[in-house]
Design a protein with these regions (language model features):
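Short, conserved micro-motifs composed of acidic
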Residues: 47, 112, 119, 123-413
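Canonical positions in the second alpha-helix
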Residues: 60, 98-99, 132-133
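Alpha-solenoid helical repeat scaffolds
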Residues: 38-39, 70-78, 108-112, 128, ...
């Protein structure tokens, strides 16, 4: 054989071997990188930093070979769970679909996919997936109520209620503004929870990927028009997350939710109190509702008579997810916590309780039949202590999350 031909042949074989080695090395490095990403993601997820965890799981998923279906399915599931927690609904739906495509074994992925589709107003596909899940888990409360919501929502949109919705541009910024609370003898102050860029906390939250929330206030001017909101004066806001506040009937005490940060432990919400002196609020003090330090306590609401503090918690003894609880407020302190039970609480999440001055309780739930996500509900307690719950329907509710109401005295006007 000609030496030149032999030499070229040897070089070609050597080149092919080198390419094969490089390909194997690339696959190996990619697999190792994916495992590192999963490990980091798990660490973030364990302490509730879902935004940071999602970034790691996304890298891990993209670095996992398509033929490795089991790992692709598991990583798609983890990514979907992060997106669900931080309310990235469309991305969550896509990730759950990937998990199911790769035969992830947990059928809950089908339920969560249906919920995400319903939250996007895709009632047809949501209904199909709720029914598929009910074939696997007959009688499941969340799927049963979700299915019913998909059937009711289109009818509610066709036959609307008498509520009129009007946007207040001056009260809304480019970021999230939510959970309003009216204050003052003439309801001329409105406290809101906001994540506007100007808030005091300069840190980006690993939970949400945006700045932590603060409490701001807007006041009415001489013409009765709302002014631009501004940060509450005094020591109310901090480097941590504050929001979802309410007031005692005498206006002397504010109850608020605060989430502190710890790089080594899960994030738990707690309820704090602040007292009013002249025009400013004091530095908040933690309100110990229970000795349980592994549960969250949030979204306080004081009953109109000042005798009860309603709040949201995932403490043991609930019905699943977040439940609404209440605790007696007395001159000697606080009583024991009581779960409101059915028909208010469900296996889903009940949140953002608030009262109308006439004693009606309003709250949001994603476990009762609704249009999608959190819907607003009204609950009235009769003389026997039984609650009657009613969905506020469209246009008060939408396929997205609807929550956080405050009422302007006895008149039929509210901010949400």
């Amino acid at each position: 054989m000609n030496w030149f031909i032999l030499s070229n042949k040897l070089r070609m074989q050597h080149g092919l071997a080198l390419l094969a080695t490089l390909a194997c090395l690339t696959i190996l490095l990619s697999a190792c990188g994916a495992e590192t990403n999963v490990k980091k993601g798990d660490q973030f997820y364990a302490i509730g930093e879902y935004f940071d965890a999602s970034a790691e799981y996304k890298k891990a998923y993209s670095r996992t070979a398509i033929k490795d279906k089991a790992k692709r399915g598991e990583r798609a599931w983890k990514l979907a769970e992060c997106y669900r927690h931080i309310n990235y609904t469309a991305k969550a739906a896509g990730a759950y679909q990937n998990a199911l495509r790769y035969h992830y074994p947990d059928s809950t992925a089908l339920l969560y996919l249906a919920q995400a589709q319903q939250k996007q107003g895709d009632y047809k596909n949501a209904l199909k997936n709720y029914e598929a899940y009910l074939e696997l888990v007959p009688g499941d409360q969340l799927a049963t109520n979700g299915r019913l919501g998909c059937l009711l929502a289109p009818m509610w949109k066709k036959k609307t209620t008498l509520y009129t919705i009007k946007k207040e541009p001056v009260l809304n910024g480019r970021r999230s503004d939510y959970s309003p609370a009216l204050f003052g003898d003439e309801w001329d102050q409105l406290y809101i929870t906001t994540t506007r860029p100007q808030i005091e906390s300069g840190e980006i939250s690993g939970i949400t990927g945006i700045k932590s929330a603060d409490i701001w206030v807007s006041k009415k001017d001489e013409k009765g028009k709302w002014e631009q909101p501004a940060s509450v004066e005094g020591g109310l806001n901090s480097e941590y997350e504050e929001g979802a506040c309410c007031f005692s009937p005498d206006g002397r005490t504010m109850y608020l939710t605060r989430c502190t940060f710890d790089p080594d432990y899960p994030r738990y919400a707690e309820i704090y109190t602040s007292t009013r002196s002249d025009a400013s609020w004091s530095t908040p003090q933690r309100l110990q509702i229970s000795k349980d330090t592994l549960s969250s306590y949030a979204h306080p609401a004081v009953s109109p008579d000042g005798k009860w503090l309603y709040f949201v918690s995932d403490m043991p003894g609930g019905m699943g997810g977040l439940d609404i609880w209440r605790i007696a407020l007395t001159e000697h302190g606080m009583g024991g916590a009581e779960n409101l039970g059915e028909p208010i609480n469900t296996a889903g999440n009940e949140m953002f309780p608030t009262f109308r001055p006439n004693g009606e309780l309003y709250f949001s739930s994603d476990g009762l039949p609704g249009m999608g996500g959190l819907d607003l509900f009204k609950a009235v307690c009769d003389s026997t202590g039984q609650w009657k719950v009613e969905n506020l329907k469209y246009p008060m509710n939408s396929n997205g999350d609807d929550f956080g109401m405050t009422f302007e005295g006895q008149i039929g006007r509210a901010h949400v």
